[in-house]
A protein has these predicted regions:
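Clamp-loader machinery-focused feature within the broader ASCE/P-loop NTPase space
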Residues: 1-123
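Hydrophobic residues in beta-strands of the RecA-like P-loop NTPase core, especially within AAA+ ATPase
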Residues: 27, 114, 128-129, 145
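Conserved adenine-binding aromatic site and its adjacent loop/helix in ATP-hydrolyzing domains
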Residues: 98, 130, 157
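Charged, glycine-rich active-site and insertion segments that engage polyanionic ligands
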Residues: 1-59, 137-140, 146-321
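Residues immediately C-terminal
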Residues: 119-120, 134, 150
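Membrane-interface junctions
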Residues: 102, 106, 134, 295-298
Length: 321
């Protein structure tokens, strides 16, 4: 997928002033909007001469000597600065600071693109900060983050931030139709879903999981299934803990909104119109789940069964169907 296929990114790209580009750029927004595609296109513009076929081929093959792409699930300190006796299977001893300290090989510039920059700990971020405070000439660092305010404020102060635009349901649905998808639309997914994630869910046969989750909640709250059965079913989903927590938060937010605004639920949620609950209790549950999600990013060893045992117990005590 390229920039021309993602109109919301193309608009952001066209507004970038490459004649006055700072050394650091942060691309921020939820997963599934194509932030890496935008970052890659910025890097291409900085490195590739369109009249130089060799440079174009090297970049397309991800072998351009003046481009370092850190695409790791978690960015470690050794990826940012040299650590003796620490070896990376893919990068070896290559790291951001050493890479940027060398003069360009075939281009005027050197560019580092870091995906999942929000996973860096404070030590890694402080190591990176040195390259932002005293940047080498013609060097550029592009950071991709899925979470706002996940980096040190000193990093934000030395970078420009490109925030991805929020898309309306109509914009997402129109894009899906342009990709040949008309059987599904945003109403079949959580409200926070992004277009590329919808596409991936459909291609990976995961597009019915959220609907199934809501049906599970109905069975559980109406005493048609006990918590052990629900937990077993949840464990069969090929999604991570954070996604399951997001599903639960989405479900509770829909019930809460309906209650506060006195709106009648329809479709998948119509059976919850008669649900009885305290808005304060459900609000507190949502806050607790949001805090749990934040804690998980710091301590990802949280036990999934313990988490859902606790919250299903709280749900049963809070919502009557």
């Amino acid at each position: 997928m390229n920039l021309n296929e993602l109109p919301w990114l193309d608009k952001v790209y066209k507004k970038i002033n490459f004649n006055n580009l700072p050394h650091g750029t942060i691309i921020n927004g939820p997963e599934g909007l194509g932030k890496c595609i935008l970052g890659n296109e910025i890097a291409r513009t900085l490195l590739v001469n369109n009249n130089d076929s060799k440079s174009i081929n090297l970049f397309n093959l991800n072998t351009h000597p003046d481009f370092l792409f850190l695409n790791k699930d978690k960015i470690l300190t050794r990826h940012i600065s040299f650590r003796d006796k620490e070896w990376d299977e893919e990068l070896g001893n290559r790291n951001v600071i050493d890479f940027l300290s060398m003069t360009p090989s075939i281009s005027t510039n050197k560019v580092v693109l870091i995906n999942n920059a929000h996973t860096m700990n404070e030590v890694s971020q402080n190591a990176l900060l040195k390259s932002l405070e005293e940047p080498a000439v013609n060097s550029y660092i592009i950071l991709i983050t899925n979470r706002s305010n996940s980096l040190l404020q000193t990093i934000y102060s030395r970078c420009q931030t490109l925030n991805m635009p929020s898309l309306t349901d109509d914009e997402i649905n129109s894009w899906l139709v342009s990709r040949g998808i008309s059987d599904f639309n945003t109403k079949d997914f959580p409200s926070y879903i992004t277009p590329i994630n919808i596409l991936n869910d459909i291609e990976n046969d995961q597009h019915m999981v959220f609907k199934d989750f809501v049906k599970l909640m109905k069975k559980f709250l109406s005493n048609q299934a006990h918590s052990k059965q629900i937990l077993q079913h949840l464990s069969s989903y090929e999604i991570d803990l954070i996604t399951k927590i997001n599903y639960l938060i989405e479900f509770l937010k829909i019930l809460l909104r309906s209650k506060i605004l006195n709106e009648e639920l329809s479709g998948l949620y119509k059976d919850f119109n008669n649900s009885d609950f305290s808005t304060l209790k459900v609000s507190n549950l949502i806050n607790d789940l949001n805090n749990l999600r934040f804690d998980y990013f710091k301590v990802p060893q949280i036990n999934e069964n313990h988490v859902f045992n606790y919250y299903f117990s709280e749900l049963k005590n809070s919502i009557k169907l």
